[in-house]
Amino acid sequence: MEAALLLAKLPEAYSIFDPLVDVLPLIPLFFLLLAFVWQAAVGFK
């Protein structure tokens, strides 16, 4: 029961990280975009 209460409090405890959690799923898209821009810069060799 204590573990359930602890898990219930975690989102409140880590609420300051909410903006970071919102951005994290976008990071792979940034890598994909970076790879495309890099290939465009070297002429798609």
Curated annotation (Swiss-Prot):
**Which positions make up the signal peptide?**
none
- Kindly list the places in or outside the cell where this protein is found, as annotated in its UniProt entry: Cellular thylakoid membrane
**Which residues form the pro-region?**
1-8
Q: Which UniProt keywords apply?
A: Membrane, Photosynthesis, Photosystem II, Reaction center, Thylakoid, Transmembrane, Transmembrane helix
According to Swiss-Prot or TrEMBL, what is its membrane topology? Single-pass membrane protein
Domain of life where this protein originates: Bacteria
Q: Which Pfam families match?
A: PsbK (PF02533)
The protein's role, per its UniProt record: One of the components of the core complex of photosystem II (PSII). PSII is a light-driven water:plastoquinone oxidoreductase that uses light energy to abstract electrons from H(2)O, generating O(2) and a proton gradient subsequently used for ATP formation. It consists of a core antenna complex that captures photons, and an electron transfer chain that converts photonic excitation into a charge separation.
What this protein is called in its record is Photosystem II reaction center protein K
Source organism per UniProt? Picosynechococcus sp. (strain ATCC 27264 / PCC 7002 / PR-6) (Agmenellum quadruplicatum)
